[in-house]
């Protein structure tokens, strides 16, 4: 990673059939493959929420995955992104599933 890479942080919420379809496990796997950190968890209202941090281009790749791909048996209706901002350092050391 070049020193010039701008670090970004963004919160997300995924709507659709995203619980009971291994969405969190696949999200964790994709995040580790891309090289971003943060977390993912199910909400009580049937969505999946979390935060992604990393170099801007990697965060953008993860945003695309969260919007269009997901786990094999999921159905993503929409994904909302919020609180997107530049950060000076990562707040997490890895990507984890929260409960």
From Swiss-Prot:
InterPro entries: Acylphosphatase, Acylphosphatase-like_dom, Acylphosphatase-like_dom_sf, Acylphosphatase_CS. Keywords: Acetylation, Hydrolase, Phosphoprotein. GO terms for molecular function: acylphosphatase activity. Its EC number is 3.6.1.7. Residues 9-99 form the Acylphosphatase-like domain. The keyword Manganese does not apply. The active site is at 24, 42. It comes from the Eukaryota. PROSITE patterns: ACYLPHOSPHATASE_1, ACYLPHOSPHATASE_2, ACYLPHOSPHATASE_3. The modification N-acetylserine is found at residue 2. The modification Phosphoserine is found at residue 93. Its physiological role is not yet clear. This is Acylphosphatase-2. It comes from Cavia porcellus (Guinea pig). The lineage of its organism: Eukaryota, Metazoa, Chordata, Craniata, Vertebrata. The gene is ACYP2.
């Amino acid at each position: 990673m070049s020193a010039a890479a701008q670090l970004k942080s963004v919160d997300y919420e995924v709507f659709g059939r995203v619980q009971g379809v291994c969405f969190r496990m696949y999200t964790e796997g994709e995040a580790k493959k891309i090289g971003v950190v943060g977390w993912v968890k199910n909400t009580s209202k049937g969505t999946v929420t979390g935060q992604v941090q990393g170099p801007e281009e990697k965060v953008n790749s993860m945003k695309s995955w969260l919007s269009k791909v997901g786990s094999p048996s999921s159905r993503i209706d929409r994904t909302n992104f919020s609180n997107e901002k530049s950060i000076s350092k990562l707040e997490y050391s890895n990507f984890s599933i929260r409960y």
